[in-house]
């Protein structure tokens, strides 16, 4: 038997079937570094329009987790796709370096008795070490960026830039000093930003407390009575017994109805709507003897339960009837609403009672409870209320309560002297910050769109921003306050610039070691140099100002405003939020044009990642087991607008999808063996009809993918590329062309037409997958035929694809109809193979019984119809001639019948043909193969 293998154009490529990503990817990273890929991208981008994505800085502490990986991969996919779209899209990674978590780590390692200077020194060293670790982990993900020159909030230039930004805000009239209740953590010993607060369930003691009337006549008059006749008390309900020692007022809603209830030996004032539930709680029976509005109770005085002072009634719209008594006790030092209402009624800062120290312990001078930790004092306060006869009821409830995000310990509101940015404070010029921010939100694009309403509601309802902290490791607030008046030095803005210049050279240490006389001279004795530091959200929130236009200038045609900020959904209350406020103060607009938000990563059951649940997916382990490209493919395939589910099983599905894409690429490369685009490529008009369709289909898909990339809809990109590889290529085109590719003469028009199409498809595909499968695309690029530059990233979307003419006879709709016919034929052949009626498709002879219009379509392919259907013979007949046993298909007007061929099998092309052995020199092969080996070769026109 003759071996005809040498006469076939069998596929051949060195592109490996096995990806070996965990081993190969680090080699690719080394290659990118050795060729200076990022620097080359900046060179070729000099004359391109710029696209700026400003990196939200991760905190320089610990290893990266799966959420970090998602964030960085999304950013990289966007910037790679923008580069391919013809933009200069730099990426400068950043790190958030100051703040309590790092200070806490240093204290744990080195103890709490460090000097402030030593603490800062160790914090800077620790942050630097953490950054190097995270940097290598981000690079391993395939993220292209200026990794040798990142921005760090602890860089001297950025610390100085932050001080200059603060100076601009002071100059603009946005900053003020105030006594206000702020989120306070005893473990931190500092105020916390809203973004540093999380909510957890907490068990608390609730108490109903009676405050005895002091103005009996006024209370009687308010209820329309000549006299009370019995002792009367107003009853409050609270979940914070520890605030009772600081009580200074009682709040009622002006429009609610309040009842005077006779319970036998005394009278109680309660919200009328809650009388029944309150009496049941107190195990009392009573009768309502009069009602009035909250408005009528205003300024009536009651007595504090155990201190010799009065508590007046103030009106407050925030009072609710959902629980309690309808009366709220007010401790202005420990509640934002309490504070605001008391200030409205003229309470001065000096009048506010604030007995809780920064560590959560009452001052020693507090009668009954001095020196006690507030949460431990709760029971002692309850006991005292019992002793004085004021406790009506106590219960234990579980409720959502604010906790420190770092220590997981309960927080309180605590009035302290802090520096604030005023949301509604009238600046030197223009609108208030709140109005500016609301307008800026309206001018910003949001992906997903619901982010706009979320950020709007946060801005509309947020309090003033407390920007000061009482920590060592932070950018200083370089203010000098007059010792007598407490006012800022009149040259504050000028002095801040002098400090900034020093910080630029020496870092924040320059302020802390500064002697006031160095700047103030003889005035120094009159001023205090404050030691407060800035909220870390101010650090990251001002990076747009001192990084984009300072340490990493990235201004483009519309200034140093970023085109895009991209972070997790928690950043509506974090970086998006603080950046918006600083941008509106400094530039009167948001520092971004568009905000993209991604969801949190959860497991396949929707649960958060947790070591206790053993469901943590570590990106480092994924890199080592599957490869970063698999993780990148998972990110691209997942709709990031909601929660993003991941597990080992989900990643394995991504690995399976990856193999299908890789195998398609390998098939393309293997069939480009011996193809030189410089000499072998055919013009479109010389290509076969099916090949022209394949290139046209690739062009249409490329347009769709460009649109999806532009809209950041990566899951659409993934699904369309995957479907193209599996269905339109693998399930149709590539299947059909195998016969032509393998059996026709190597340099025939039929084969070169096919290779031309494969080359164009490969050039397009390698670019399509580059933003997602960064490593694999780079590998594929090295194996493509023809001269090319060092990296696919140094190119733009492929421009060699051609569109079918509008009048092309075998147009797109035509091939859609042919695909439908082929699908029906395949379905029947699968049934026959399953029934063992035929061994393979080429054993089949198919007859298609069709309506006239479909006959016309099928007849256009002439004798090449069999190559499209991948059968040994294919014939067409009128539908009316279909035998009774013809199979009805899903295609309208089509029936078919498949028979097993009785002809011999060609040893070369495997078709069963009647002319096998007709040529005595080649008794084992068909006439077509004889012609392809030793004759002029077969001629194809369509497929």
Swiss-Prot record:
A GO-annotated cellular component: cytosol
Compartment list: Cytoplasm
GO molecular function terms noted in the UniProt entry: aminoacyl-tRNA deacylase activity; ATP binding; isoleucine-tRNA ligase activity; tRNA binding; zinc ion binding
Record key words, sorted: Aminoacyl-tRNA synthetase, ATP-binding, Cytoplasm, Ligase, Metal-binding, Nucleotide-binding, Protein biosynthesis, Zinc
Domain comment, as recorded: IleRS has two distinct active sites: one for aminoacylation and one for editing. The misactivated valine is translocated from the active site to the editing site, which sterically excludes the correctly activated isoleucine. The single editing site contains two valyl binding pockets, one specific for each substrate (Val-AMP or Val-tRNA(Ile)).
Pfam families: Anticodon_1, tRNA-synt_1, zf-FPG_IleRS
Motif ('KMSKS' region): 608-612
Free-text cofactor note: Binds 1 zinc ion per subunit.
Any one Gene Ontology BP term: isoleucyl-tRNA aminoacylation
Motif ('HIGH' region): 58-68
Major localisation: cytoplasm
Gene field: ileS
InterPro entries assigned: aa-tRNA-synth_I_CS (IPR001412), aa-tRNA-synth_Ia (IPR002300), Anticodon_Ile_BEm (IPR033708), Ile-tRNA-ligase (IPR002301), Ile-tRNA-ligase_type1 (IPR023585), Ile-tRNA_ligase (IPR050081), M/V/L/I-tRNA-synth_anticd-bd (IPR013155), Rossmann-like_a/b/a_fold (IPR014729)
Residues reported to bind Zn(2+): 906, 909, 926, 929
Enzyme class: ligase
NCBIfam families documented for this protein: ileS
Tagged with keyword Metal-binding: yes
EC number annotated for this UniProt entry: 6.1.1.5
Protein's name according to its UniProt entry: Isoleucine--tRNA ligase
Residues that hold L-isoleucyl-5'-AMP according to the record: 567
Job of this protein: Catalyzes the attachment of isoleucine to tRNA(Ile). As IleRS can inadvertently accommodate and process structurally similar amino acids such as valine, to avoid such errors it has two additional distinct tRNA(Ile)-dependent editing activities. One activity is designated as 'pretransfer' editing and involves the hydrolysis of activated Val-AMP. The other activity is designated 'posttransfer' editing and involves deacylation of mischarged Val-tRNA(Ile).
Catalytic activity annotation: tRNA(Ile) + L-isoleucine + ATP = L-isoleucyl-tRNA(Ile) + AMP + diphosphate
Top-level taxon: Bacteria
Chain positions recorded as ATP binding sites: 611
């Amino acid at each position: 038997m003759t071996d005809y293998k040498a006469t076939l154009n069998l596929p051949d490529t060195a592109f490996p079937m096995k990806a070996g990503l965990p081993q190969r990817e680090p080699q690719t990273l080394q290659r990118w570094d050795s060729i200076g890929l990022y620097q080359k991208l900046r060179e070729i981008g000099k004359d391109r329009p710029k696209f700026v994505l400003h990196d939200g800085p991760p905190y320089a502490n610990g290893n990266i987790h799966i959420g970090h990986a998602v964030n960085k991969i999304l950013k990289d996919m966007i910037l790679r796709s923008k580069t391919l779209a013809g933009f200069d899209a730099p990426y400068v990674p950043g790190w958030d370096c100051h703040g309590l978590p790092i200070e806490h780590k240093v204290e744990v390692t080195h103890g709490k008795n460090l000097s402030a200077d030593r603490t800062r020194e160790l914090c800077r060293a620790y942050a630097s070490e953490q950054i190097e670790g995270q940097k290598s982990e981000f690079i391993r993900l395939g993220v292209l960026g200026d990794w040798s020159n990142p921005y760090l909030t602890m860089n001297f230039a950025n610390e100085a830039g932050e001080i200059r930004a603060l100076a601009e805000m002071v100059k603009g009239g946005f900053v003020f000093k105030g006594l206000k209740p702020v989120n306070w953590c005893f473990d931190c010993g500092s105020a916390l930003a809203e973004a540093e607060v999380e909510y957890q369930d907490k068990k608390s003691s609730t108490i109903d407390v009676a405050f005895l009337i002091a103005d009996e006549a006024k209370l009687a008059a308010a209820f329309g009575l000549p006299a009370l006749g019995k002792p009367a008390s107003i009853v409050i309900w609270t979940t914070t017994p520890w605030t009772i020692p600081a009580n200074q007022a009682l709040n009622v809603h002006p429009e609610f109805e309040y009842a005077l209830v006779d319970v036998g030996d005394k009278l109680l004032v309660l919200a009328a709507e809650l009388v029944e539930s309150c009496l049941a709680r107190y195990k009392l029976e009573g009768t309502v003897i009069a009602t009035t509005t909250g408005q009528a109770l205003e300024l009536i005085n009651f007595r504090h339960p155990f201190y010799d002072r009065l508590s007046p009634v103030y009106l407050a719209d925030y009072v609710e009837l959902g629980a309690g008594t309808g009366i709220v006790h007010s401790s202005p030092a420990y509640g934002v609403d309490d504070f605001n209402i008391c200030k409205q009624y003229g309470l001065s800062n000096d009048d506010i009672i604030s007995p809780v120290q920064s560590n959560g312990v009452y001052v020693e001078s507090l009668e009954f409870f001095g020196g006690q930790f507030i949460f431990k004092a709760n029971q002692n306060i309850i006991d005292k209320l019992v002793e004085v006869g004021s406790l009506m009821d106590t219960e234990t409830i579980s409720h959502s309560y604010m906790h420190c995000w770092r220590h997981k310990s309960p927080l309180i509101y605590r009035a302290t002297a802090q520096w604030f940015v005023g949301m509604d404070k009238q600046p030197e010029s223009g609108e208030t910050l709140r109005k500016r921010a609301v307008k800026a939100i309206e001018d910003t694009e949001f992906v997903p769109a619901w982010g706009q309403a979320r950020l709007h509601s946060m801005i509309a309802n947020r309090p003033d921003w407390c920007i000061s902290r009482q920590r060592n490791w932070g950018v200083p607030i370089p203010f000098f306050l007059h010792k007598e008046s407490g006012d800022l030095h009149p040259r504050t803005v000028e002095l801040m610039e002098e400090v900034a210049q020093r910080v630029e050279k020496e870092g924040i240490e320059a302020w802390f070691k500064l002697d006031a006389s160095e700047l103030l001279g003889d005035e120094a004795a009159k001023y205090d140099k404050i030691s407060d530091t800035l909220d870390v959200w101010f650090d990251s929130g001002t990076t747009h100002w001192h990084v984009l236009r300072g340490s990493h200038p990235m201004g483009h045609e519309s200034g140093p405003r970023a085109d895009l900020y991209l972070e997790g959904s928690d950043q509506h209350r974090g970086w998006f939020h603080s950046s918006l406020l600083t941008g509106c103060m400094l530039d009167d607009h948001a520092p971004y044009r568009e905000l993209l938000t991604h969801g949190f990563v959860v497991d396949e059951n929707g649960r958060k990642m947790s070591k206790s649940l053993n469901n943590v997916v570590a990106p480092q382990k994924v890199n080592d087991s599957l490869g970063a490209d698999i993780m990148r493919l998972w990110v691209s395939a997942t709709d990031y607008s909601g929660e993003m589910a991941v597990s080992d099983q989900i990643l394995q599905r991504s690995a399976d999808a990856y193999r299908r894409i890789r195998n398609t690429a390998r098939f393309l490369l293997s069939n480009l063996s011996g193809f030189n685009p410089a000499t072998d490529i055919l013009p479109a008009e010389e290509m076969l009809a099916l090949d022209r369709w394949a290139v046209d289909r690739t062009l249409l898909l490329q347009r769709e993918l460009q649109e999806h990339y532009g809209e950041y809809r990566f899951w659409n990109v993934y699904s369309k590329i995957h479907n193209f590889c599996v269905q339109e290529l693998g399930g149709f085109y590539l299947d059909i062309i195998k016969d032509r590719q393998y059996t026709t003469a190597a340099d025939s028009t039929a084969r070169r037409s096919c290779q031309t199409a494969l080359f164009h498809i490969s050039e397009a595909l390698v670019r399509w997958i580059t933003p997602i499968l960064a490593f694999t695309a780079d590998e594929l690029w090295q194996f493509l035929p023809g001269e090319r530059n060092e990296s696919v990233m140094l190119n733009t979307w492929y421009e060699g694809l051609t569109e079918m003419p509008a009048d092309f006879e075998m147009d797109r709709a035509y091939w859609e109809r042919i695909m439908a016919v082929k699908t029906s034929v395949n379905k029947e052949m699968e049934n026959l193979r399953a029934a063992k009626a035929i061994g393979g498709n080429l054993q089949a002879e198919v007859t298609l019984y069709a309506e006239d219009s479909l006959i016309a379509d099928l007849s256009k392919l002439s004798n090449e119809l069999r190559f499209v259907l991948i059968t040994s013979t294919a014939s067409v007949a009128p539908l009316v001639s279909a035998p009774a046993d013809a199979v009805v298909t899903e295609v309208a007007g089509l029936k078919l019948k498949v028979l097993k061929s009785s002809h011999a099998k060609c040893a070369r092309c495997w078709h069963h043909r009647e002319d096998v052995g007709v040529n005595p020199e080649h008794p084992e092969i068909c006439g077509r193969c004889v012609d392809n080996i030793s004759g002029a070769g077969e001629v194809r026109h369509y497929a």
